[in-house]
Amino acid sequence: HSLSKTRYYLYFYDGRRSRIARNVIEVQDGGEENGVFSANMYAYLEDLSNYYQCKLLYHGTMRRGDTFVNFNFENQNNKVERAFLYAIHSFSNGGRMEGLCCCLSTQPILPACFKFLLSSEILEETEELKEKLKVSKEDIRLLKKMNMFVISDHV
């Protein structure tokens, strides 16, 4: 029997290109082992309906808890590069999860961390979404106070 897949749409704001970056994460349903699911991330998509035409492909895992979900991915073109995503799993925001991704930026090559929004449905790419994905004054205030980048508000 074939396993079904759950698809998530991941959005973040890429300040280098001044636009929202589109990504798709596919999670293998029913294939979990000790709460760990197999997952793929198709990164930097022009067209969400044709996500096999991605600029970067990652293979990895997803772990789901009561309040958080995390993904651990390995870049298939550069095995040294990994992406770790942590999202707040809230039931009150219509299938959307806000989180942080830590990875290696390619241009320039530096460790990086950015906010993202994960949705079970395709989102309209509005100015409101763009502002939500950008680093806010509150994000900077908390960064200075706590000396760490944290997600301060919920979707």
Explain the meaning of each model-derived region.
Residues Y51-V155:
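C-terminal regulatory/effector modules of DNA-binding transcriptional regulators
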